[in-house]
Amino acid sequence: MDFVKELKSSQDYMNNELTYGAHNYDPIPVVLKRGKGVFVYDIEDRRYYDFLSAYSSVNQGHCHPDILNAMINQAKKLTICSRAFFSDSLGVCERYLTNLFGYDKVLMMNTGAEASETAYKLCRKWGYEVKKIPENSAKIIVCNNNFSGRTLGCVSASTDKKCKNNFGPFVPNFLKVPYDDLEALEKELQDPNVCAFIVEPVQGEAGVIVPSDSYFPGVASLCKKYNVLFVADEVQTGLGRTGKLLCTHHYGVKPDVILLGKALSGGHYPISAILANDDVMLVLKPGEHGSTYGGNPLAAAICVEALKVLINEKLCENADKLGAPFLQNLKEQLKDSKVVREVRGKGLLCAIEFKNDLVNVWDICLKFKENGLITRSVHDKTVRLTPPLCITKEQLDECTEIIVKTVKFFDDNL
């Protein structure tokens, strides 16, 4: 490891990563070395507001001391034993999760993509064993422009050509419908071989697309009418991001299955969870699904503490309190911008859509960085604004100034 001493500048570190790592990402040119709360710091110790939050993984803020201590304390005792044995941590975590979210059972996995893959299997099995769909005929409805990961099942469910190009053949029997379109959904639900509808309460990777208030009550009603599982992918929208513990709580509905991930560990460890009641979850029998790392003692301890921080520090309430004024303030200050098409969001899951014929969002992200705020674009026209939920009003006001200043720079240089 003597070569580490040769790495001095940000460019050295970037060149090192590009030389020895696969080129499956195109990072913003900043080399981060530490984080605390809403801030991250590069190797030259420049400070930035983090407005990506690792795609909403650090809702609790970077390196939260309580979560970190829970992680260290458990790591000193037992990190993994596999599900071949019971542990003294997993059952505690499972009980905490099911009580908190109001479901009978939880299945612990590691990543959001694994949660989605688990849901595909769970829903298909329920379809065959409970709904009595003919063998190998089960179908799952998803929405256009959804995003649930980059595993083969997830890209099979996707409509993103970049995710699918040269990765076929794909998993069959995913039906695609427009988002926020109950008429199109009902048309597909009439197929008796449909077992599930999997949907994001807000479409994040599509550009933070917020549905109409009537959409999810309509979804719940239609799924019940046609005996189809309503599955909410809350991996990004859940755990306070939109101002509620679950985004579906805004709409007064309870999905049959909930998918969670990202902030389930506060950014300290990969943890995901699938929640459902017994009539759904118990179709899975021993040996039919699992993961070596899923539900390990270290993950269980971290998960419980991350959720306690979310609840005890009232981070959901903070996102709810700050989100709407932040959004309204941005809309008001950017209403005359020549490069902004729309400002939208829910809670602290926000975005600005730019006119990509006038401005390049990559350049906007670079200017944000220069001005002390880092985030990332969604495709070629939208920039996410998703700070940790521990952000204060004063900090958010300062960030609003940075955002407006950055947009004004591009307005003035058209």
Curated annotation (Swiss-Prot):
**Pathway(s) it belongs to:** Amino-acid biosynthesis; L-proline biosynthesis; L-glutamate 5-semialdehyde from L-ornithine: step 1/1
Major location (coarse): cytoplasm
The record's Pfam families line, in alphabetical order, gives: Aminotran_3
SUPFAM superfamilies linked: PLP-dependent transferases
Q: List the disulfide bonds.
A: 154-163
Top-level EC class: transferase
Q: Where in the cell is it found?
A: Cytoplasm
Give one GO molecular function term: pyridoxal phosphate binding
Which cofactor names does the annotation list?
Answer: pyridoxal 5'-phosphate
* Cross-referenced InterPro entries: Aminotrans_3, Aminotrans_3_PPA_site, Class-III_PLP-dep_AT, Orn_aminotrans, PyrdxlP-dep_Trfase, PyrdxlP-dep_Trfase_major, PyrdxlP-dep_Trfase_small
Q: What is the effect of changing residue 154 to S?
A: Severe reduction in catalytic activity. Does not affect TRX1-mediated activation. Severe reduction in catalytic activity and loss of TRX1-mediated activation
**One biological process term in Gene Ontology:** L-proline biosynthetic process
Q: How is its activity regulated?
A: Unlike for mammalian OATs, activity is increased by TRX1-mediated reduction of the disulfide bond between Cys-154 and Cys-163. Binding to TRX1 may also induce conformational changes that facilitate substrate binding.
Tell me its EC number(s), please. Answer: 2.6.1.13
A single Gene Ontology CC term: cytoplasm
Q: What's this chain's function?
A: The enzyme has a very narrow substrate specificity and can only catalyze the transamination of alpha-ketoglutarate with ornithine or N-acetylornithine and, to a lesser extent, of glutamate-5-semialdehyde with glutamate and alanine.
Subunit details: Homodimer.
By what name is this protein known? Ornithine aminotransferase
What organism is the protein native to? Plasmodium falciparum (isolate 3D7)
